[in-house]
Amino acid sequence: MLLKAKPVVEAIEKENSFILTPANKKYLNLAIVEVGSSDGSEGYISNIIKQCHKYNIGYQVHSFPEDVTEETVAKAVANISNNLSVSGCILMQPFPKGLNMESIKQFFSTSIDIDGTVKESIFSLLYPSMDCGYAPATAEACIRILKHYNIPLDGAHVVVIGRSMVVGKPVAMLLDKENATVTLCNSHTKNLQEITKSADIVIAALGKKNFLTKDYFSPNQTVIDVGFHCDEDGISGDVDKEVVDYVKNITPVPGGVGSVTTAVLINHLYKSANKTCILKGEA
């Protein structure tokens, strides 16, 4: 079965409708910071902007050339963080080499971190009582898809391929909270095919086009393909197309994780706007 994004997105949109009020609506303002550009990032930003137009969300895109100074980006991030009308900000990653992202993140307020970028947001995945920031949107999108389609997580063996702080590690933390048994694999993992074949669920987030062929899977598995590659051959994921008809469940590319990720970001923005409204005593 194809685990399509549309019904998951519709469920998130319904959730958003219960969050939105006349009081918090005025705080629905999003900032996007981009340094340099790529086809992937431009497409991602374009999708977010479409959603902003759809829901009448204010937005600003702060674009900088690759040779921008670290001081300039840090100053822009600090100004955004201090702007009380902004409830959400996305730092497009990765930054070009030469820019110290960790240094820039010091100026980024956790309260508007709707994509789980700063360390405090990641800590909150380990310590929910901290209640600061949000999970990285792509990692949360994977969980939302699995839950929407009633794929059992409690006790399931989930293999995550890729250990980035954007997807791999945070999705492993989220799965652990669901009582799944998680195996986190990377480029140094030995006997990867044996490991992936033994899983109930495989989450592919390695960033290599069509890398995972049918040889990596078993017929009764659920596969979440996070990869997104756009070139002259069209759009592909990390999982080869031949796997679609081989496994039990799989997310399509396109029309899978990416669309849900955008919906999750908007959901985080709604929640952040509501928190801002409450803090100002306007709820």
Identify the residue ranges that each predicted region occupies.
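Short, well-structured alpha-helical segments in soluble
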Residues: 72-84
